[in-house]
Amino acid sequence: MGLFQKCSRLSLRSSYMWSVCPQYSIAVTARETPDRALIVHWTQHRDVHNSRRLGANPANPSAAPPRLPFSRVTQEDLSFFRALLPGRTITDPDLLKSSNVDWLKTVQGSSDVLLRPKTTEGVSQILRYCNERNLAVCPQGGNTGLVGGSVPVFDEIILSTSLMNQVFAFDNISGILTCQAGCVLENLSHYLEERDFIMPLDLGAKGSCHIGGNVSTNAGGLRLLRYGSLRGTVLGLEVVLADGHVLNCLATLRKDNTGYDLKQLFIGSEGTLGVITAVSILCPRKPKAVNVAFLGCSSFQQLLETFQCCRGMLGEILSAFEFLDASCMNLLEKHLKLTNPITECPFYIVIETAGSNATHDEEKLHQFLEEVMTSSLVTDGTVATEATKIKALWSLRERVTEALTHEGYTYKYDISLPVEKIYDLVQDMRRHLGGMAKNVVGYGHVGDGNLHLNITSPSKDFDLLAAIEPYVYEWTSQWKGSISAEHGLGLKKRNYIYYSKPSEAVALMGSIKAMLDPKGILNPYKTLPDNIN
Amino acid sequence: MGLFQKCSRLSLRSSYMWSVCPQYSIAVTARETPDRALIVHWTQHRDVHNSRRLGANPANPSAAPPRLPFSRVTQEDLSFFRALLPGRTITDPDLLKSSNVDWLKTVQGSSDVLLRPKTTEGVSQILRYCNERNLAVCPQGGNTGLVGGSVPVFDEIILSTSLMNQVFAFDNISGILTCQAGCVLENLSHYLEERDFIMPLDLGAKGSCHIGGNVSTNAGGLRLLRYGSLRGTVLGLEVVLADGHVLNCLATLRKDNTGYDLKQLFIGSEGTLGVITAVSILCPRKPKAVNVAFLGCSSFQQLLETFQCCRGMLGEILSAFEFLDASCMNLLEKHLKLTNPITECPFYIVIETAGSNATHDEEKLHQFLEEVMTSSLVTDGTVATEATKIKALWSLRERVTEALTHEGYTYKYDISLPVEKIYDLVQDMRRHLGGMAKNVVGYGHVGDGNLHLNITSPSKDFDLLAAIEPYVYEWTSQWKGSISAEHGLGLKKRNYIYYSKPSEAVALMGSIKAMLDPKGILNPYKTLPDNIN
């Protein structure tokens, strides 16, 4: 009992507030052992002060809380699922393996059943049944999340959208696409490009991630600077609520002010309030001309000045302004054998333009490049207009995450800060950690003020971890930043929410959860902190 | 009792669902007469079938419901307010007049007190007191709404944001503005233009409307096509909840995925869930070049083809594509003495470009104009690049609403439809009404699929109204449109919500209202329908 001094669960009696029930879940867990929850990432348990701010396990706020008293899946349940989804109720442990572990292989669940419905009605029947039986459910898209949000923590039933991959409609006048939640982002991109449109979002995981998962996690990615967030581009959603009711908000209108915009509740709530089954989204025209420039800067200050100059001179054709530091480049060369196309620099920039007139775009880009080269803001650079070369330059930015996985163990932080502060955190962290870390690297979306801070060590190192956290969160909070800019909170970051949100806001989130999912069956242990007071 | 056969109110006992309490409120109302509610717009009461779909008063779903049993303002209450807001507690009936009636002079309340706090703390103390005393409150910004959402229906206390007009901060690197809710949109525009930025929204009412009201109503306006909706550009809000608690979500980050995005609840909920006291908003750079073209088309089909061509050729510099029909032009000439700058046509288009390179923009615009003139899509046109001429061309679109007010009585509809359908509704309505209406005119935002359908008669005409409604809503619903694209529902449209939203969605809205404002004191009788089942 020493380890988890407090735990919280959704109260069944109150629909308004989560209530903290000390010891109750622990007692249940103890009775129902063995629980097979295993957080590979976190295993050290130290005796430190119980901090209310950091939730159930103050020594290790990312660790899984005790299993909540959900029912266990019985043979009778399996019979129900098999009758409902013949051939699509998976219980073979080998087939379940990849769905029980996240992409980073840091969170390991132990679910015994994976359901693969094809229709909204199927999802509805599953949730109605699970809600009645008090069975917990983990909705899963492409399972590419980085915060342990898309895998079970214990034995939650995995509800996969992988067979829900139909495009319902595309209107080539308005550019509005309507499709099922399980469509893979890259497949949608190909579908649209054939029709002279593009998706308003793009990210490294596009080959696997599902649009439903993108919406559930409010994915940002590489095009946010230009096309804005999913909160603006998603026009409609169909969602199945915890009790199986289908909420049809699948509008295909650019403007609709009839009542509260319910779909916003489900964007970014990581499957904890409902399961998204279909999406309608506003897609931009495919640009007639795309150019990518890869530039080098000798300081972050020069990089920022280049960004300012770029926004002024490229204006409406600027579609991405990304950066990586020299340490990232070293890892790309070392592990992925990618070649640095320019001379070595402390900082590299990827600039993309997308416009409707190739001549105009090239002229703007060349004027900009001339300006930043003659003023010595940029020390070297290369430009690509041809698709293969564009892809090669982009891969230098997109494959940093992959390169890092070869380094041993990676501690990942996804931070929003005022743009002029983003690299200060990397430099300060290097000073702070001294020789403890193998690498402290920074890359990300300058245009959005979004830093991906990654710290590597040969293997898991809890002394290193203790030096990073909560230091990184305190640093972020001090500058009124966000401790999760685009990755979400999932399992790993849930208890750090108070560094970015006041307690009144978190309490209200708990009320919303309790209203929509009173039994708490949807993606438990995710997003919201263990203790909401 | 015949008139209002059912009425609903927020249940005090349940936080989960609105409950329908037949007759209860009626009884209270009868005891507490005189109630001075007067809906100027609607006075006819006919004996028709009670339609559940259309709420409390099926003959006249826009009419005010009976007064709910809120407390009446006492001398003791006034003493409290005067101590809290010395000199800013207005009870002089002459001074209250303009705050009791909407801009269109169609909804008339009878509030006896107008409060003008300067700070969030002031708003908090007012709401805490009103919630405890069960006093209803009508939040009011610039009072420019068109659906009766910003004026009291009975004796609700008017809580004005007019003295909350401070700019807190502007970051000229990120373009993020943070200000109080009562800042007038045009003042913010001037403030930003001096700093080489612009507001991401612009609308005809800019000289009076408040940014807090814009956000509360999710105002669309003229720049939505380019800069997207407030759901994407508003980065943070500070909101005072019904019980006086301050919810600080005033982030200034472009990306933040830490938990549910609570601010979205308050965008577009018309002050029924909380009072917005401060806003942070992402502002675009001021474009270096602006051009406006005013064109004529001989059919709506040609107008649509011009739109398609325009999107392709102007691409990223297109910032507005608006239209008005010949009837609108006649009214502009007749009542406002504006001059049509081109030859007479059935349809007129206002196209605005905004870009970073004047030469490129002019070249794109000229190429586009050459294309649409030589292909005869457009019959005549004029272009302005100079500010005064740009303003003059824009006024032809912006002042249509004003011209209509001179026509006698106007029935206003703000409809979203698939863009190729928007003028069909105008033509069909003309056929349907025959000689009953004086004018049936259409104008609006083609780029957003948003039609402003306006029907005039010399004076209020209930036979005409009965011919328009619910016909117009049924027509819209048949094409899966929105019965309120950007104006909101307010008092006038609240009971028509079911034409655009399924009952499950409306019930969930009721649950959210009950959770955040269990006594229902915030802007009662607005947004949600009288009967939620």
Curated annotation (Swiss-Prot), chains A, B:
(R)-2-hydroxyglutarate binds at R397, T401, K412, N454, H487. GO terms for cellular component: mitochondrion. Belongs to the FAD-binding oxidoreductase/transferase type 4 family. One of its GO terms (biological process) is malate metabolic process. This is D-2-hydroxyglutarate dehydrogenase, mitochondrial. Residues 107-286 form the FAD-binding PCMH-type domain. The keyword Cytoplasm does not apply. Its cofactor is FAD. Keywords: FAD, Flavoprotein, Metal-binding, Mitochondrion, Oxidoreductase, Transit peptide, Zinc. Pfam families: FAD-oxidase_C (PF02913), FAD_binding_4 (PF01565). It catalyses: (R)-2-hydroxyglutarate + A = 2-oxoglutarate + AH2; (R)-malate + A = oxaloacetate + AH2. InterPro entries: FAD-bd_oxidored_4_C (IPR004113), FAD-bd_PCMH (IPR016166), FAD-bd_PCMH-like_sf (IPR036318), FAD-bd_PCMH_sub1 (IPR016167), FAD-bd_PCMH_sub2 (IPR016169), FAD-linked_Oxase-like_C (IPR016164), FAD-oxidored/transferase_4 (IPR051264), Oxid_FAD_bind_N (IPR006094). GO terms for molecular function: (R)-2-hydroxyglutarate dehydrogenase activity; FAD binding; zinc ion binding. It is found in: Mitochondrion. Its EC number is 1.1.99.39. It comes from the Eukaryota. (R)-malate binds at R397, T401, K412, H487. Residues 1-55 form a transit peptide. The gene is d2hgdh.
